Amino acid sequence: MVCGESNAAAISAKYVDNDPLQRPAARATPANESHICDLMPPKGWKKDAQGNYPTTSYIKEQEKLTVDDLLFPRSIITSLAKDAVHQAVQTAEQDPRVMLSKDASLALQRSSTVFVNHLLMHARQIAQSNDRKSCSGEDVLKALDQIGLAGFESVVRERVVEYEKEVQRRRAEKTPAADEGQAEEGDAADEEEGSHKRAKLDEH
């Protein structure tokens, strides 16, 4: 009787192994688990506006970024540096010609990028402490004080005021031009309407 039961159990087990429908669901293997982990974003990644995590390809692209990819344009940094030195030289009544070597331009490019990101990090912390998502100009000025550069606050304020005045001046110059364009379009429309009215009168 025992032998019969053991034989029946063996036959049943063989039948289950040969029939895919009777096989129990296989547990995820470590390889499958690692594959699932690869699909999940690293800790700290946030969802986008659609509620999706960054794709694996996007994460890999971010991992491939180097310091050179994050640097400010060298031409702009060099131009700003030359303007600053040019103003200082003119004040001292010296030769206004300014020459920057390749190494000097590279040093300015790298240092300016690091400085701005360091300053912005402190400005963001100040904004977050006030329950704000975006940084304001005052946050940046307070950040200057936090990193020990409070002496530049007055200079930055002056530059901001100059920039705002320049923006307003350019807007004021564009507004009359836009008004003139609208006036010309209105005159053309009036002339066209008048010609249509004259044509109708002639028909009558």
From Swiss-Prot:
One of its GO terms (cellular component) is CHRAC. Its main location: nucleus. Residues 165-204 are annotated as: Disordered. Keywords: DNA replication, Nucleus. InterPro entries: CBFA_NFYB_domain (IPR003958), DNA_Pol-Epsilon_Subunit (IPR051377), Histone-fold (IPR009072). The keyword Nucleus applies. It is found in: Nucleus. Residues 165-177, 194-204 have a biased composition (Basic and acidic residues). Residues 181-193 have a biased composition (Acidic residues). As accessory component of the DNA polymerase epsilon (DNA polymerase II) participates in chromosomal DNA replication. In eukaryotes there are five DNA polymerases: alpha, beta, gamma, delta, and epsilon which are responsible for different reactions of DNA synthesis. This is DNA polymerase epsilon subunit D.
